[in-house]
Amino acid sequence: MSREVVVKVKVPSHYVGDIEREVKLAYAVDLFLRGIVSVERAAELAGMSLYDFLVELRRRRIQAYPYSDEELREELGIE
């Protein structure tokens, strides 16, 4: 059974921006890095497509899969 928890945090207004999205993303990345959820589940928790989540991981220099770019191209048969 899944349930949601609401967490209230006081943040100075000049830092707010799109804080809900940022917090969800940070939490999803953290869960992924700790091996608690898969990359697919983390993307879902962040409210992002898998592609967009992978782009975000790459931007943060986080490896989503244990392959180098060359190994991944070989595995997928891409030249």
Curated annotation (Swiss-Prot):
Q: What superkingdom heads the lineage?
A: Archaea
Q: What name has this protein been given in UniProt?
A: UPF0175 protein APE_0890a.1
User: Which family is this sequence assigned to?
Assistant: Belongs to the UPF0175 family.
Annotated coiled-coil positions are none
PANTHER family the UniProt entry points to: UPF0175 PROTEIN SSL1255
Q: What lineage does UniProt assign to this protein's organism?
A: Archaea, Thermoproteota, Thermoprotei, Desulfurococcales, Desulfurococcaceae
